Design a protein with these regions (language model features):
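N-terminal auxiliary segments of SAM/dcSAM-dependent transferases
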Residues: 1-87
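Conserved class I S-adenosyl-L-methionine
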Residues: 123-134
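Conserved SAM-binding loop of SAM-dependent methyltransferases across substrates and taxa
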Residues: 134-146
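Conserved SAM-binding motif I beta-strand of class I
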Residues: 148-153
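S-adenosyl-L-methionine
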Residues: 154-195
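A short glycine-rich, Lys/Arg-flanked "PGG" loop and its adjoining helix->strand segment in the class I
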Residues: 216-230
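Conserved beta-strand signature within the Rossmann-like core of class I S-adenosyl-L-methionine
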Residues: 231-239
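Class I S-adenosyl-L-methionine
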Residues: 240-277
């Protein structure tokens, strides 16, 4: 069992219980996955994994993890600030330099991923997950009965976030039966090493065009067509960029390139759904 993750609502609930002299509260220490009885003391509070000090400062939109002697934000400062961010739904999103990587306005990012996974019908299929992120696409595929998933993630920092996020699937978990392979690497390069027609379905959730233009290129789409079997489905997340401010219609540009690569494509949800011809 992992050490607790603390957010501002949990921190405030702990302090309020201490103020009122309540000996226990029912709370989630893993971002909403489970709930447990939490003991409230004057200087420390405790759950199933031990007792912990109260935070002196707790910021909104921040998740704190236990390092062994103190709580620290789940964030890393390297080439960019990569941060796990709580949501009202439970499953967190993440940000890179303040840019939110997953939709959270209307639905949980986990549920959003589950809906998109359903478009490619992964049951019994071998799935390529090009940009793994927090692993919510992979989790949806595992849940839906995919035969196997190969997932790439370029960022070492994002992979670190996954180790602390209780909603991210663990490739080594016995219940997954070895069906998830998580590989660190740049999929724009690694895809060239994948076999022809090696997958029945593809989920492509790249960073925005301005950050990772190579993942929207004709050359990359040609590679997606090469590794996908005929009749296989691809969902390509594009978001809904403002055409008036960007001067581009990214979803339709993507559709045209996919058609050229050998797909039949149409707009679906906040992206493009395509089938290999």
């Amino acid at each position: 069992m992992a050490a607790p993750l603390v957010t501002l609502p949990l921190h405030e609930a702990l302090l309020e219980a201490r103020r009122r002299g309540v000996p226990h509260i029912d709370a989630s220490l893993d971002l909403g996955r489970t709930r447990e009885a939490v003991a409230i003391g004057e200087h420390r509070w405790g759950g199933a994994t031990g007792t912990y000090p109260y935070l002196e400062t707790c910021r909104d939109r921040t998740i704190y993890h236990w390092t062994g002697d103190r709580f620290e934000p789940v964030a890393r400062y390297g080439d960019a600030l990569v941060k796990l961010v709580p949501t009202e739904w439970g499953p967190p999103t993440f940000e890179i330099d303040g840019i939110k990587m997953l939709p959270t306005a209307k639905v949980s990012p986990f549920e959003d991923a589950r809906t998109k996974v359903g478009l490619v019908e992964p049951r019994g299929r071998r799935v390529l997950d090009t940009c793994g992120g927090l692993g919510y696409f992979a989790a949806g595929c595992l849940e839906a009965g995919a035969a196997g998933i190969v997932s790439f993630e370029k960022s070492e920092d994002v992979l670190w976030l996954r180790t602390l996020n209780p909603w991210s699937p663990d490739p080594d978990a016995p219940e997954h039966g070895g069906r998830l392979q998580l590989r660190q690497g740049d999929v724009s390069q690694e895809i060239e090493r994948l076999p022809d027609a090696g997958f029945n379905a593809i989920l492509h959730d790249p960073p925005r065009f301005g950050i990772a233009g190579e993942l929207y290129s004709q050359a990359f789409y040609d590679q997606l067509a090469r590794v996908l079997r005929k009749g296989g489905r691809l969902f390509h997340y594009t978001g809904s960029p403002n055409r008036l401010t960007s001067g581009r219609d990214v979803p339709r540009e993507v559709s045209r390139r996919l058609e050229k690569a050998g797909f039949q494509a149409r707009l679906a949800l906040d992206g493009v759904l395509a089938q290999r011809r």
